[in-house]
Amino acid sequence: MDLYPILKQMVNEAADPLYTAVKLAILGNSLDLMVADTAAAFENSIKDRLDAPLALEIFSAFEQQLRASKRLVYFGDNAGEIVFDKLLIETIKELYSPEIVFVVRSVPTLNDATLTEARFIGMDSIVRVIENGIDGPLPGTMLRRCSNEVNDLVRRSDLIISKGGGNFDTLDEQIEHLQKKISFLLLSKCEPYYRHFGVEIHQLILANYFKFLPNNAQN
């Protein structure tokens, strides 16, 4: 199923393309929860879920940080949802023209995105795509196990975008090392996320950890 044209049209027709692209990127984290046999059924499922709430003040802080950022690192998660990530990255580039590096797993765990999937959807045609350098399967990102290249990019970045629960579970423990310049995009899939973020199960989570922007915490 070719999802991209459907998603692209949703963004193009939106009153706020970035807001819609962010929501779609988070909804991509719920592909494993969706049941759709046809493109029309998938489109209807996505449109229904686009009504899910996403706090405007949190989104506004994210947008403000994007405006001030020249270098971004985007940690991808699962293979299927990187089509959604590509759409968000394209939207960010069109609006703010930052330098973006998309990081995939060197070794997949189950359905993790790798260079193969990123190249298949053409991610490498719009941004630089690199592996995280972790030797062995790990459903997340531990910076001490990542390559020197990834760590150097993280240090020099103005903003890190972390996609999915696996990346949140690992990177959240490294906030101080990340200098509080990270935004987590994920779906509230379980009780621990509900307790941590105060976001109902199956709802959208955008959590910002910024050093210099006020009023930007999710919880």
Go through the PLM ranges and name each one.
Residues M1-R71, I82:
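Electropositive, gly/pro-rich neighborhoods at or near active sites that engage anionic ligands
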Residues A52, P108-N111:
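Short, small-residue-enriched loops and turns at beta-alpha junctions
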Residues R71-V73, D158-L159:
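Structural motif
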Residues F75-K86, V107-T109, G165-D169:
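Gly/Ser/Thr-rich loops at beta-strand to alpha-helix junctions
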